[in-house]
């Protein structure tokens, strides 16, 4: 069954970079994406990009200008996979769009891309797993790698055979940003970034939410501020907006 995995605002003059679960990158200009209404079904992304039938888009980034050499050589694309692997590559490596896409990261057979973020080289990273734990570390702990590299261990998962990463966030302003997590049954929790002690990458992290049968497993982690409105969308497409 199809469901929404991410959402965001788009500037028609910007370029969207789409990343698939198998680790490929594709490009579209925002104005090339058909505009719809609140209740319309939308267009299948496979009809707009040359994506393999057994692959799917799991993340995207918006970039205004891939020709700005200063920008693309001072920003990075940060990948996180289901199994806790993290990879950091210079944005410049993805600045030459190709119709059939390019390999953005080498993914092992039992893994998939679940989150992609753009960083400035000085962000803090928080990764969360299904079992309600989160790890915080500085992105300098992740060395820059080539476009097709596999990556390094970002978080160690529980050995219960069911644990996996559900999200990764990049913190740009620890003074104003807070952490929001949401569980399968719609329970949410907001907490200060300082509740998550800084550690080295690759650890198991600290508890971010108490997981019970009532709450269900964790499904997402986001950074939010007091000025943000929150929109939570379930698998049926029902949207709830919160202040």
Name every feature range the model reports, one short phrase each:
Residues 14-56, 86, 90-93, 138-153, ...:
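Conserved glycine-bearing catalytic or ligand-binding loops at nucleotide- and phosphate-handling centers
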Residues 4, 57, 61-209, 213-242:
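Conserved structured catalytic cores and adjacent interaction surfaces
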């Amino acid at each position: 069954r199809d469901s929404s995995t991410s959402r965001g605002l788009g500037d028609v003059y910007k370029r969207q970079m789409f990343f698939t679960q198998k680790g490929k990158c594709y490009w579209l200009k925002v104005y090339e994406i058909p505009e719809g209404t609140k209740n319309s079904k939308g267009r299948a992304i496979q009809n707009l990009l040359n994506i393999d039938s057994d692959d799917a888009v799991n993340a995207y980034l918006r970039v205004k200008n891939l020709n700005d050499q200063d920008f693309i050589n001072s920003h990075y694309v940060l990948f996180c996979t289901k199994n806790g692997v993290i990879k950091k590559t210079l944005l410049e490596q993805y600045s030459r769009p190709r119709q059939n896409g390019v390999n953005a990261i080498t993914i092992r057979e039992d893994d998939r891309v679940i989150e992609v973020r753009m960083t400035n080289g000085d962000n803090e990273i928080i990764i969360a797993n299904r079992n309600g734990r989160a790890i915080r570390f500085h992105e300098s702990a992740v060395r820059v790698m080539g476009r097709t590299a596999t990556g390094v261990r970002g978080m160690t998962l529980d050995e219960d055979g069911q644990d996996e990463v559900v999200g990764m966030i990049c913190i740009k302003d620890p003074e104003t940003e807070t952490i929001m997590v949401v569980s399968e049954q719609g329970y949410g929790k907001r907490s200060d970034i300082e509740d998550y002690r800084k550690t080295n990458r690759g650890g198991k992290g600290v508890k971010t939410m108490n997981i019970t049968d009532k709450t269900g497993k964790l499904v997402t982690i986001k950074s939010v501020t007091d000025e943000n409105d929150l929109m939570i969308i379930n698998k049926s497409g029902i949207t709830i907006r919160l202040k």
